[in-house]
Amino acid sequence: MNIGFIGLGKMGRVIAGRLIGAGHQVRVWNRSPKAVEELVAKGAEAAARPADVARADFLVSILANDDAVRSVFIDEGVLDAATPGLIHLNLATVSVALAEEFAAAHRKRNLGYIAAPVFGRPDAAAEGKLNIVVAGDPTAIERAQPILSVIGQKTWPIGDRAERANAVKIAGNFMIASAIETMGEAVALTRAHGINAADFLNILTSTLFAAPSYKLYGGMIAAEKYQPAGFTAALGLKDIRLALAAADAHNVPMPFASALRDNFMELIATGGGENDWATLAVLAAHRAGLD
């Protein structure tokens, strides 16, 4: 398949690498040239400007936030330059409002749009073990399945309205952040009673909370290791704000999301923004006087 790819951050570069490894023709663009050079060495073609990648059958993008998506796709003319009939798979965690806006913008230009946010960190992406939540035209999703099957281990369709996939992703990330926060507070409580964090978390993640997220982040909290960051606290704040905006639009109270937002803001204000978002546990320990 002829694929354009925009966004070569931690996730994007490994996903693009998998597509190249699967034999697809991939043309890449990224603001930072170093990531482009890395992919060219693996067989990708470098695009001089973002609009050049839109002359393809499929376009895959994974950018940091709504502003980056609008800047590249609208301001830099990617949508207007796209080949008619192109199908765009947007893997990014963007707002529900932007998903609605972009679905309409693609329809207006006779382009397909699939909201396809992913669950998983860069190591899972490198192994093709992401879970992909997809929403959009069923025919477009079927056509894109050869790409989706390279990127992830399972595709979860959630209907034809693009914004639904992003609502699922945002809600899921809220749940992960909530799990990290509760583990951090529980560890602070048990540490205050003389219990080793690793011992406590080993019990809980082997019994009541044996899910992968608890094991992964529990291990990070026990080891107090928040670098390298698979997902930063700054990105965590971005996603909690997306959850609150989506909730506000439908009058859904989310009091714990508001508390998480404030905690992430405090972390960032005190220099922890580029640490893994599991560093929420550090804030809980600090407030308990356990520095």
Describe each region flagged by the PLM.
Residues 74, 92-174:
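Rossmann-fold dinucleotide-binding core
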Residues 1-62, 81, 86, 122, ...:
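NAD(P)+-binding Rossmann beta1-loop-alpha1 motif at the extreme N-terminus of oxidoreductases
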Residues 162-288:
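Helical "substrate-binding/catalytic lid" subdomain
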Residues 15-16, 35, 102, 147, ...:
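Hydrophobic residues within alpha-helices
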Residues 50-111:
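Rossmann-fold NAD(P) dinucleotide-binding segment
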